[in-house]
């Protein structure tokens, strides 16, 4: 029976064989089996549709010209699928138009097998199947080039395969390959500047030991369910990946593991490279800049703890235009002869697309896709990058030192318990500067994070990042403030690892530092500074368990720990420029250390608004009736001069001078030149407001009238109470001018109106009520309260905002620059922290090669020891504490005429909790300033 079936099949196939076929005009062929012998060519402008077929074979080459279309579709119901075979080893396959193979309506296995001596696509190819069962699609040739668009689509995810090229050869892709619901496992090398886009739960597995992918080629993870997996046992490569984020995955074919020198994964923010490691086998992914190291997480990919995901949106990085060519479903096949009259066009050829995706607003392009695809010049913008070393040397001459402390416990899956402490190299540089307006600062932040992943093991690790210490000479003049010193603290944690039979425990000791703040007292003297090194050894235990037993390895790390010694002195100076300037300066400096320029300018203006709003209404109500009774007649004159002249003069003069003092906050924020410009500008604002006072009072008393009462009460009350208090609260300069004029007019009119009407009725005719109601109150309020109050708040708030903003902004900018220079590790910075206090320190001295001790016969020697801890990113990409740096200041000589010798030498005691504190009479304050300068270094 089988022989008979094969014979019938051969007969039917022979009946459909023909010689070389030239399709010049559009046509539709129907039938279950189609066979074509010889070369087939579809000419431009023609559409050829083969419908209702289950088997279509070509025994020769195939060429589809630009503007031509070839459709092969199975529409015989859901059972019979489409099988297309084009197998020739001596003739090429060339497509410059549209080829569509469609078996989406069937529920059975479909197979697309197209190959030739060479394969070239400059147009569009669509390979569509149902995905209900395993389907395959192969486009193979020894010479394989795609400059156009290839879309491989399944209705749903099945265990189908798609492959391009010939095994262990090279394919060139300069166009777009879209994979939707597919598994793609290339067995070839890949070169070119094109893109492979993974969409709708597509899984891509790349490479082995002899295959490579050029860094210029792009992979685009378009949705949150797609994955890119790289063979772990392979030569080190850098893969260019776009769209990583929102939960999609990058991984290796082996579980991610670290060793004593490297972590399981590391992200380098300066280069945008993510490194994944299976012990000694790393692979690199160029994912772009802007990722947060805290949002990376290790996950499973098909049963292995071998991938990393990112729990955040994709940063706005540039995506090449070739990756943004739309992955469309393609044009529909003509169903009847009437459909052939409508020319079939490419879905991309007739559309103008914008290449800006959700991840990028950089690339924007509108073009005819076929024209651009047929040209081999279509390229993506990409950059190749060398592998970045995980050891980073950092040089900095900044005067700010920031130490970031992270304490993290991460519980991870697996059958082993790993405890590690690691540190990378430390670079120490020194520079010399002299400045009268810059400040030295040291800040410390502490973060705690815990991440837990359920499985059979527990992993705890503590690591440290690169630390940069800089010693700097400066001459600074400031007032006494606060300093932060640190005492050493030891934290011990237990690591538990369990399998099915037993649990083991390891004890890990972590050294940290605890900050404590004290007031500093100014002293005088020189500052000799030096940096020395000692060697610190840290030992950790690594426990590995399999199904039968557990083994332990002891790893010892040796690091060079810097010890910095200094003597420090401070001097104090007082700001000049009048009482008002002094008050403003104090207000600004007290709040400036909190949040830099923002807090400093905000509090300065607050003082101005309170004084202005309080004084305005009191003076206005007190003089309303008096001015009204003195001035007699003149209705228009009294009202206009009372509210207009008093208000305008107070506002003009006070506002102009007051705003000059207030504008100091902007200059401080940009240059950080100090607090002295604030007081000077503030005092000018004071003199300006006195002019407003004189003009207001003269105009008010010069003309007053009965009719003026109506105007005084109406407009005066609205502008006085409403605008005065509002403007005062905004800033120092606005407070001075607006409160002076507005409260005067407002309160004056209210009081004048109330009393004037009563007196007017007793006195008789129109002149009686007019004088009482009008100009007296308006003018007196404008001149008395408005101008006087305008001058004082103007000067005070002006200098306050100037001082606060400058001190805060200078510190903030230095902090940010310091932390950003650390490459490849996660740090956190909080610019402006405690900068107000640190601007009060004054440091002078010279760097020396060795620690220096100064003393005389009548002097007493003191010393203080301080510790600083550094950190490094962990195996899970998050920072951990590791190295403690002991900082030992050089002994400083105290004057021999110290009255209390018993308190001149500080000592270091130990509390019950194991931490150290500095004690010892008056000298403890000097010890604290020494510690502050050490931290600045």
UniProtKB/Swiss-Prot annotation:
Keywords: Cell membrane, Cell wall, Glycoprotein, GPI-anchor, Lipoprotein, Membrane, Repeat, Secreted, Signal, Transmembrane, Transmembrane helix. Residues 610-753 are annotated as: 7 X 4 AA repeats of N-E-G-S. Glycans are attached at residues 16, 236, 449, 488, 580, 585, 595, 603, 619, 631, 641, 649, 711, 747, 759, 773, 897, 913. Its main location: membrane. Residues 393-414, 841-851 have a biased composition (Polar residues). It is a lipid-anchor; GPI-anchor. Induction: Induced specifically in response to hyphal development. Residues 817-829 have a biased composition (Basic and acidic residues). A lipid is attached at residue 913 (GPI-anchor amidated asparagine). Residues 1-20 form the signal peptide. Residues 344-392, 415-475, 567-590, 666-682, 726-742, 802-814 have a biased composition (Low complexity). Nonessential component of the hyphal cell wall. This is Hyphally-regulated protein.
